[in-house]
């Protein structure tokens, strides 16, 4: 009987360990692109990057109140704010902007996986990493020819 309990305990432990190893564990404080964290204020972004080249209002039921403000800095670097806080950053060019783990457009997919682990979801050419299992926020890396072609950080649509 004692043997049975040990065997059951070992099996349970192995199942828990293997289940935890499957998910990428991206902590929320890793949601940083170009030195700007998820939730940063408009004033902080302005202090780092200055005034945006263009400002647009976006309408989407996904956003609180149905709208967001997008700041475009040029060179395919855009920041979306909802209620004055960063909710998404998008980079789609080799412009030197990178994540806190040094992943930028042009980075090899193996370097991406070494930095963040296996993605939580692969949807077509997108490698998706959730923050602590929350499928509403994280990173989406678009992969083309085994390289990062686009980075989205924040709200996942």
Question: How would you label these PLM feature ranges?
Answer:
Residues 1-10:
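Bacterial N-terminal signal peptides that target proteins for export
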Residues 20-26:
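Sec/Tat signal peptide C-region and signal peptidase I cleavage site
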Residues 29-36, 96-103:
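Second-shell loop/turn segments in exported
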